[in-house]
């Protein structure tokens, strides 16, 4: 499975591409950070991010895109910009019929470090080890994008099992409702 990891942001938007293998084997294919100046109009910044993400999608052909879920407990302006950046990337994926999954920061940290409360340096260190990189990815947005892709590779089987279980439960509920309706006649 080929996963594009996205650490959304207006000033710096991390993009990564990971290929998963057997078990927990993951290989880094590419990583970059798209930068937009704060003094550039919002629509131009979003266009720059969208263009870069679309180029990545068309070049690398990911099977799925993993985007960090935004929380509003940050600065409101920062949260809004981060959500907008993630939104244009999700839209670009939808236009290409690429599945999108959102992961919380604590899910990502727990997946790569074992602790949902890990700091950025711990995440960067583990990403470097997991991917057997020669140097730590910089800036932190690059490491976070890689961590998001790793997280999705490792969580995807569980996500698929949960979706299958939910579908089965819904089918059983539907059949039960049909039986009740038939019995009432």
UniProtKB/Swiss-Prot annotation:
First-listed, main subcellular location of the protein, grouped into a coarse class: cytoplasm
Signal peptide: none
Pfam family, any one: RuvC
GO MF assignments: crossover junction DNA endonuclease activity; DNA binding; magnesium ion binding
Catalyzed reactions: Endonucleolytic cleavage at a junction such as a reciprocal single-stranded crossover between two homologous DNA duplexes (Holliday junction)
Co-factor requirement: Mg(2+)
GO terms of biological process kind: DNA recombination; DNA repair
Binding positions (Mg(2+) 2): 68
Note describing how the cofactor binds: Binds 2 Mg(2+) ion per subunit.
Lineage top rank: taxon: Bacteria
Compartments reported by the entry: Cytoplasm
Gene3D superfamilies membership: Ribonuclease H-like superfamily/Ribonuclease H (3.30.420.10)
Keywords: Cytoplasm, DNA damage, DNA recombination, DNA repair, DNA-binding, Endonuclease, Hydrolase, Magnesium, Metal-binding, Nuclease
PROSITE patterns xrefs: RUVC
EC number: 3.1.21.10
Protein family: Belongs to the RuvC family.
PANTHER family for this protein: CROSSOVER JUNCTION ENDODEOXYRIBONUCLEASE RUVC
NCBIfam families, per database record: PRK00039.2-1, ruvC
HAMAP family per record: RuvC (MF_00034)
SUBUNIT field: Homodimer which binds Holliday junction (HJ) DNA. The HJ becomes 2-fold symmetrical on binding to RuvC with unstacked arms; it has a different conformation from HJ DNA in complex with RuvA. In the full resolvosome a probable DNA-RuvA(4)-RuvB(12)-RuvC(2) complex forms which resolves the HJ.
Protein name: Crossover junction endodeoxyribonuclease RuvC
